[in-house]
Amino acid sequence: MSTALRIVVAGAGGRMGHAVISALRNRNDAVLHAALEAPGNASLGKDAGMMAGGAPLNVPVTQDALAAVVRADAIIDFTTPASSVALAALAAQARIVHVIGSTGFAAADEEKIKAAARHAVIVKSGNFSLGVNALMMLVREAARMLPAYDAEIVETHHAQKADAPSGTALMIARAIAEGRKLTPEDV
């Protein structure tokens, strides 16, 4: 019998962090190993399970990323570009998996993540939803089939949305560009 994967949730106090912690709660193949938040975050010191709206998990939210990755198998990260870049470097040093759902990366950040990926498995997406990824396939094909049509991306978000354009909007722009064999800047 295999042991459960030990998961670090970075951005534990956010909406996606809560969702990941809740999803891990009743799994036999994965457990919450550590919960990370930024220095000064109101969630620090709280039990991650209770913070996510459930029973205690006896995993306090911490800001100590280095201690969190010790003996971890993977990091699931919904934080900020700066935090994701730092976590990618730690994942590379520890040779663990790093799943990045953060968005808003500068080109220099992307290069640092690519460098870290030489030593760690890194999975990065602006949106992990099955529906959105199916939409990307459809957008790519429509852009290829309808080159004479203009493409426009319009989005609306909740008031707490941290980045604009969103990772999903950028994914749509890349899908249009791929369908038309252009660069995203030319779309």
For the regions a language model picked out, list residue spans one by one.
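Glycine-rich, highly charged phosphate/nucleotide-binding loops
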Residues: 50-67, 76-84
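Active-site-lining helix/loop region of Rossmann-like oxidoreductase modules
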Residues: 2-28, 41, 56, 143-187
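Short, ordered loop/turn segments at secondary-structure junctions
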Residues: 38, 103-105, 127-128, 156-159
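NAD(P)-binding Rossmann-fold cofactor-contacting core
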Residues: 26-53
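Rossmann-fold NAD(P)-binding glycine/threonine-rich loop
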Residues: 85-94, 101-122, 133-142
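Structural detector of well-ordered beta-strand residues that form the stable sheet scaffold
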Residues: 8, 33, 62, 97-99, ...
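An anion/phosphate-binding loop that grips the pyrophosphate of nucleotide cofactors and donors
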Residues: 72
